[in-house]
């Protein structure tokens, strides 16, 4: 007996050896739906994985992080790779941009309730996320809650935005024993830039002026990519040229200062 992507697969020989109670347990487990948290990549539909595309085609419903599919970036990326999803059931899941723990908890619980209801109907759901589902993805909270309730939730990797950004810039993120640090926008900028190796500053839009100032003070090599793989993409190759009006989808890569 083996479990493959949330389903129990039993050989004929093993099935004959199962008790009636065990057979019923297997049937009930396989009747329940499941959910995939799918990373659609950073922006270009061509960067979405073959596995992600296959699972989107097979899914009964598509859950999107937003109110409408027309304005949901993750959905538009997936649509570019798999046009067939336009005919599927769309489930809007809204996560407010706030640090209020009570509001966040309420939105997570509402998301879990709506997704669980679909799985209770035996449906397979694909939840879309930008970049990679394991890197600062809101789905992570929902994933843990669904697992705790006994539902099958599987994470499907996508190309991380910082890997795509480095490729766009034509630079390496790590060489030899060089460490790589991934820092959220909420991390103290000054402390982060003191770390040795490559520093990847995610979602720094609101603090971009502070980040730029610290980068200029440290005189370390820095790059910025805005809207990687999307419309309005910008590549910046020095700290001095980083715009202070950079948008939400802005990512900065900083290296150690080169010794003269």
How should these model regions be labeled?
Residues 35, 193-260:
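A contiguous loop/helix-start segment that scaffolds small-molecule binding in enzyme catalytic cores
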Residues 69-71, 98, 160-163, 230-232:
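Short gly/pro/ser/thr-enriched loop/turn and capping motifs at secondary-structure boundaries
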């Amino acid at each position: 007996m083996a479990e493959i992507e949330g389903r129990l697969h039993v050989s004929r020989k093993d099935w004959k050896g199962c008790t009636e109670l065990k057979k019923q347990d297997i049937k009930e487990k396989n009747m329940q739906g499941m959910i995939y948290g799918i990373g659609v990549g950073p922006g270009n539909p061509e960067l979405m994985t073959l596995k992600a595309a296959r699972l989107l085609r097979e899914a009964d419903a598509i859950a999107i992080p937003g109110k409408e599919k027309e304005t949901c970036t993750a959905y538009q990326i997936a649509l570019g790779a798999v046009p067939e999803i336009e005919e599927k059931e769309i489930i809007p899941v809204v996560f407010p941009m706030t640090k209020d723990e009570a509001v966040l908890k309420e939105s997570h619980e509402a998301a879990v309730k709506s997704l669980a209801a679909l799985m209770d109907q035996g449906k397979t759901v694909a939840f879309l996320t930008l970049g990679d589902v394991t890197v600062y993805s809101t789905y992570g909270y929902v994933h843990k809650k669904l697992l705790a309730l006994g539902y099958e939730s599987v994470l499907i990797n996508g190309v991380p935005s910082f890997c795509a950004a480095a490729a766009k810039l034509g630079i390496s993120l790590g060489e030899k024993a060089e460490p790589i640090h991934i820092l959220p926008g909420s991390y103290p900028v000054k402390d982060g830039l003191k770390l040795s190796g490559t520093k990847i500053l995610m979602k720094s839009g609101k603090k971009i002026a502070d980040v730029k100032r610290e980068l200029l003070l440290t005189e370390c090599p820095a790059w910025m990519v805005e809207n990687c793989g999307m419309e309005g993409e910008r590549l910046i190759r020095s700290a001095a040229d980083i715009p202070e009006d950079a948008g939400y989808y802005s990512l900065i890569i900083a290296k150690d200062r080169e010794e003269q």
